[in-house]
Amino acid sequence: MLKDSGDIMWTEGTNAIIVHSYVHQPLVNVRPGLALGPHGSHINVNTTWWKDGKAWVDYLNRAQTLLQRGRVPSDVLILAGESLPNRRTRVTSYDWPVVHAGYYFDFCSPKDLLDSIKISDGKIVAPSGVKYSVFSLAEEIRPTLNTLKAVKKMLDAGIAVCGMRPIGSPSLSDDDAEYAKLVNEIWGADNSKNPRKVGKGTLYPEVSALRALTDLKIEPVISAAKNFKCIARVCDEASIYFIVNTNMSNANGEFSIRANGDKTPEIWNPETGEIKPLPQWKRDGQTIKFSLEFDPKESEFIVLRDGAEQKHFEKFSAQKAEGYVKPENIDIIEAKYRLRGTKEGGKDVKEILEKVYPDGFSVSNRLFGDPYPNKFKELYIKYKVGKRETEKIVYESENHFWKGLEWMPPQSIYPTVLDGAPAMVFEINGSAEGELSDGAKFSTKVENLPRPIKLSSDWSVEFAKDLGAPEGEIAFDKLVSWTERPEFGIKYFSGTAKYSKSFDIPEDFISKNRKVLLSLGEVRETARVKVNGKDAGILWKIPYEVDITNLVKPGKNTVEVEVTNLWYNRLVGDEIKSPLKAGETPKWVLEGKSRADDNSRYTFTLSKGWTAESKPMPSGLIGPVEIRAAEVVKAD
C-alpha cells in the first residue's frame, strides 16, 4: 500500500517522500511502541519489516533521484486566481482533462503575470527560461483591470489564451468603463462561445486549455493506455517519463511520448537499478510510440538520452499455445463490506465486486461506500471456484490481486533485449512474430518448456524467539496462512519466520538462454530469499517472484525464505490473553521490560484499533510456490 500511494503521489507532482515521525519513538523497550493510529504510517526501528524495508527505501531513492531532475515540461501557464486568500489551492475538474490528455501546466500569480513573465517568439517565457504556448485564466471570472491588460498584451503578441468572459473587477479602484471596453475587445460584444482572433493570438472562451493545445498541434508530452498514470521531467541531457500500472493484474500498455531530437529510449527500473534499451518502439515524427508489459502495480521509468540507436522491435505480437490453462471462473455467492471482526450486518457489495474482481481491486470506501464511518472495516467474500466453495476476508485499504483468489504467476510472451540484441521471453509455450527496426521480419515458436516444479508442501519453519511462537523447527505439510494453524502462538504470531526446503531440478530444466524463476505466490508481507545459501533478494510487493538462474544447479538445491508479517496479529493475540483498558500502561512497560513477566503479553502501544474478537490478518508464505522456466530467444 505504501508503494501504491507513493507512486500515485509522484504522478501528481510530489517528488520527495519524508518519513516524518521516524524519530518520535521514545519507547525503546517495547514494540511496536507509540504509533500514529489512523493518522499515518508507523515506520521506525520497531516496525516488523524494518530491515526488509531497505528494498522499498532503495526504490524511493532511485525514483526520487530521477523525479527531482529538471522540471515538468509544461505547455500551459494558469493564473492561480485573484482572490485573497487564494481559492485556487488544488488541481480542479477543469484541469484534469488536460492532464489526462498528456499535457502539463504551471501556475502563476497576478504579480508574476505583471512583473516577471515576458513574451518572445509567440511563447510566454518565465524567469527560469521555461516557455509556455497557452495561457489560461481557468475559472477566474473576476480578473483585475491590470490582469486584463496583460491578457490583451499576450493576445496581441500571438499567444493562445483561454478563459470565460469576466463579469466584473474585484477592485473598486479599477475604471469600470475601461474595464468593459477591454472585455469587449477580448471576448467580443456578441459573447460568442467560439474561438476568435485577437491581435496575432486566439481567444478561447472556455476554461479548459485542451482545445487550444489541439489547435496548435502541440503533441502530448505522454499519452498512456487506460489505467496507467504518468508524469514527465526534462533536463538538458534527458527526458524522463515515470509510468505506473494502476491495474491489480499484468497489463500491456500502449504509449506515445514527445521526443524532440534523436534521443533513444531506455528502461530504468527503480526496483533493481537496472538500465536497458527499450525493446519495442517506433519513431513517428516528433513522438516515439511503444508497447510495454507491466507486472501488477509495477512502475517503470522511460528515459530518452543521447546514444546510438540499436536494432529493436517495431512490431511484435504473440500467441499462447493451445492448452494454455486459464483460471477457472469464479462464482461469487456472497460479499459484505462490514465492521472488522464481526459476522453480522454489513453492506451487500456482491454486484460491485462482480464488476471489478477480474482485474483486482482495492478494498476501500471509494469502491464500496462507507457504511461505518471512522471504523475499521473488512470485505467478507464467499465464492466458488469450480466445485470448491471458499470464504475469504480482505481488510480495508488492502489491495487484492484476484486470479481465482489465489495469486497465479504471469504467463506471458514479451519482447526484451539479450546481449544488446532484440529477443523474446516465453514464460509459456507459444509463438511470436513481428518486424525489426531494420525491416527484417521474424517468426518464432517455443513448444517444449518444462512444467513448473511445485514446492507447496513439506516445508520446515522456524519462528523468531521470544515472540510467543513454539521454539524449534515446525513441519508444515502444506503452505497455509499462519492464522489457519492450530497453535495459538503461530496463529497470532507477528515477526519473522524462516521457511526451509530442499528440492531437485532435472538436468534438462536448465539450459542456455533459459531463465529459472522462483515464484512464491501469495506472501504476507515481505520475503528475504536465499537459494543454495546465496542471497536472491528481498521481495516486498506482488508479484513475489525472483530470477534464480545463476543460483540453481541440476540436482539437489535448497531454498530459504524469511517471511515477515505485521504487528496486528500479535496485538490481537495479546488482547485475548491479557486485555488492557484504554490508556492503561502495564507495570512491566514502566519498568523497562520488553514483555510481561508471565509471557501473557509481548506487545504494547497506545493506539488501539482492534479487540480480542478481531480476526488475525493472513500471514506468512501462503503460496503456491513453484519454480518455472522461461525461454529467451533472439529475434534472428
Stretches found by the model and what they are:
Residues E344-Y357, D504, V546-K556, W567, ...:
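Short, surface-exposed tryptophan/glycine-enriched loops
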Residues F503-I505, F509-N532, W540, V552, ...:
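Aromatic-lined ligand-binding clefts that engage carbohydrates, nucleic acids, or primary amines
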